[in-house]
UniProtKB/Swiss-Prot annotation:
It holds the Pfam family Ribosomal_L20. The gene is rplT. Signal peptide: none annotated. InterPro entries: Ribosomal_bL20, RIBOSOMAL_L20_CS, Ribosomal_protein_bL20_C. One of its GO terms (cellular component) is ribosome. GO terms for molecular function: rRNA binding; structural constituent of ribosome. This is Large ribosomal subunit protein bL20. It comes from Borreliella burgdorferi (strain ATCC 35210 / DSM 4680 / CIP 102532 / B31) (Borrelia burgdorferi). Binds directly to 23S ribosomal RNA and is necessary for the in vitro assembly process of the 50S ribosomal subunit. It is not involved in the protein synthesizing functions of that subunit.
Amino acid sequence: MARAKNGTVHVARRKRILKKTKGFWGTKKSNYKKAKDTLXKGMMYATRDRKVRKRDFRRLWISRISAALSDTGVTYSRFIEGLLKSNIKINRKILSNLAIEDVEAFKKIVLEIRR
């Protein structure tokens, strides 16, 4: 009886990896061994950066709010403290958009906090 070498599964596995590395540069897209290593590293970066993206956006929103507050003479920390005391429930993303797109509404919120 002939030995079954499982050829179709072997080819399918390699094909699946090489399909995922289609846009990679050099031998990383065509050499299975390098493609497999690069794909694993890419997946690690993707997993890490899904977490980092959240941090980066929060930092961006805070810096935008701080920049908008520099005209009003209120610091960011006092502003957030005032939001909590005034029981205004607006998150940093919305505040950042207000500071950029609707300056008058943002200034009204700052005036409300100063009371």
